[in-house]
């Protein structure tokens, strides 16, 4: 199935009212009582007038339907040549400022403000400079929107492709629409991988995590790279799924991702 040849409607390209809508859904699913947002309880987040969250559900229907093993390979081949556009970092930050929508009920913050708050919270807690930089850059991969990429190919919980899907991934029922679900090469426990092969050998669904990791992989320590590459892989670091693909080094390194996750989720402050 050649997903890049498929034509999507405007609604299918942008099912969410804003990219923050996905992040707020994650916040609702994974609250941490010991981390408080200033003047706002966890129960107050995601206060939409329509409680059905139809846009988030539609977003995941599209994400789980079209994020196939072949789709991920195609996107890597397309975008990891880094031949699309060149811009200074501050221009990229200015672009991220456009990725906010008045329909987001939780905050009027743009994406750049979220990055500033994340990095400042990390600095305030005395973490090393490389981690502060990681916080500042962790969502920079959302510049994929510059290239008219569908939202579901930029944000969303990430997961391994090329093997069976975990039922702990949000809205797992939508994977039945994915052609890999019935492909015997991809729908077994290990799929195209070997037991404990290590995440470096596993393809993860395509989006901003992988893109910014590939951009920065030669510039920050490995601990920060784990934070970048897997910060949306909630089925692993919140649910403990796909442990059979991990090697000992993955298990050791994830403690750094665990340190980063609260800053990503809970630093957002209006």
Where are these regions (language model features)?
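Alpha-helix initiation and N-capping motif
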Residues: 72, 86-93, 221, 253
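N-proximal short alpha-helices
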Residues: 62-65, 69, 87-91, 105, ...
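Tryptophan-centered motif/residue detector
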Residues: 22-25, 90-93, 130, 206
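A generic structural signal for ordered alpha-helices
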Residues: 34-37, 70, 74, 96-100, ...
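Divalent metal-dependent catalytic cores for phosphoryl transfer on phosphate-bearing substrates
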Residues: 107-270
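Active-site flanking loop/helix segments enriched in acidic
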Residues: 77-113, 194-199
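Residues that form generic nucleotide/phosphate-binding pockets
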Residues: 59-62, 78-82, 92-99, 215, ...
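Non-catalytic interface/linker regions that flank or bridge core catalytic/transmembrane domains
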Residues: 1-87
